[in-house]
């Protein structure tokens, strides 16, 4: 690790330690996404099979009745693909909007923390002014990844339509196809995230528009590939450290695993994500100074 990376890691740690309020947007974002996801899922379930939630909550049916109801639920899902699609897209748009608002907030907050003092209200006011360009970027990102999901969705729908008449060879085909497409999607999503690493920072820190922010972010990446790869590895190690910390809880069964997951999520929101965001902000600040600015667009 070079001296510059060491300085960045130290600066991020000190900024978070002096300004623990940097964790607030991450916590609020996480809770908001969970709430929206649950609300969207329950709305879809209730629209497709209104009697299902009440039946599950009553708990007055056995395994066989549950299997029958679940089978009926799958049939109704296949008959309401359009409704599920609209609900899913609506949920994605809401999540993208939340990501844009909170991401602008925490980037500005971490930037201010590195400067010396982070104030929630000041950073939030700045975030609101940049919501539109960052929201457009989040929609572009969501659209790119969403389009890549279409073959996998079609594969899953085809599987459920033919589930009662599948041969062993056909089942093996679906399993292999699913694994291949899942691997492709994972690689594609990681590649897109990597290429657009610095775009949110360009929009929030340099006050760029959506397109000029994309150009600026890609340019910073192109001139700093090695540093970016190293930073991604360091961020990945920080995430792995959370998993290691939560691993001992697994020895206590289901509830222990659940508690360990909860601890890892909370530590991620409160410490790891603010610190690693400070790292990215500091890296962007240092590396973008040498580049010519693009006009807003």
From Swiss-Prot:
Keyword entries, A-Z: Cell membrane, Membrane, Transmembrane, Transmembrane helix
One GO location term (cellular component): plasma membrane
Entry superkingdom: Archaea
Keyword Protein biosynthesis (UniProt): no
The keyword Membrane appears for this protein: yes
Compartment(s) where it occurs, according to its Swiss-Prot or TrEMBL record: Cell membrane
UniProt membrane topology term: Multi-pass membrane protein
Chief location: membrane
Transmembrane annotation, as ranges: 26-48, 80-102, 134-156, 185-205, 225-247, 262-284
Protein name (record): Uncharacterized protein AF_0863
Lineage: Archaea, Methanobacteriati, Methanobacteriota, Archaeoglobi, Archaeoglobales
